[in-house]
Amino acid sequence: MNYREEILKLENKENSGCSGALVPGIIRKGKGHKFIVFGLNPAEAKDDLEGFFNKKFYIFDPDDEEASNTRSQRRWTKKISDILPADSQIIQAEMIYWTSQNRKSLENLIGKLDFGNPYFDLSQKINNDLISNNKDALIIMLGFDHIDLFEKVFDLPELEKTINGQNNKRLLYKYKSNNKFFAVRHPSSRGLTNIDKEKIKTTLESSII
């Protein structure tokens, strides 16, 4: 499945009104375990928009050096790397691949994020293919605000365990009878300490089979 072609085909058929989209792919090559890391959707950072100001609809693609080497993308890769085991291979993915400032603005543009929405449906088709092609990967959702979509899309069972951080705030969720899926506190969260990051790392390391 050519993710870039499928995204552009839908965008050309039904103009989303979004500034761009992200193609899932490897953002850090490592010799360690593989992680597919999900966010809600790609944000629209100011320096990204300036870098692609002359494009009607831009694509972030890990295979495109120019598009994947923006300042915001480098910052983002660093943040994700800080909470994963050393030398991990990181695949960036999204619940929805079209850009926006937040969930509300995204739904204002493309409609409710649910099955039957063409942008939602294509994103899940891409994600199913991505996971199928990386069966050994652990699946991580960043943040808890949009965990409803994560659980609905992947039909996750009830929570098995919640691990709290230094300030006693939720740090990580594990799912009962499914040791591949986790939700972790967003790496941009205020108050996330180095001790918290290490706790996330060690929990994930202990789940690697």
What residue ranges belong to the model's regions?
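C-terminal capping/extension of enzyme domains
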Residues: M1-S16, L113-Q124, I147-I209
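Active-site and ligand/interface coordination hotspots across diverse enzymes
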Residues: M1-T70, W76-K79, S123-N133, L171-S177, ...
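A structural signal for short, well-ordered beta-strand segments and their strand-loop junctions
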Residues: F35-G39, S88-M95, L138-G143, A183
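Short, solvent-exposed loop/turn segments at secondary-structure junctions
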Residues: N41-A45, I96-S100, F144-D148, H186-R190
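Alpha-helix C-terminal capping segments
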Residues: I80-L84, L204-S207
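Internal catalytic-core helix/loop-beta-alpha segment
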Residues: D82-K135
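Acidic, glycine-rich loop-and-strand cores that form catalytic or ligand-binding grooves
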Residues: L130, K135-D155
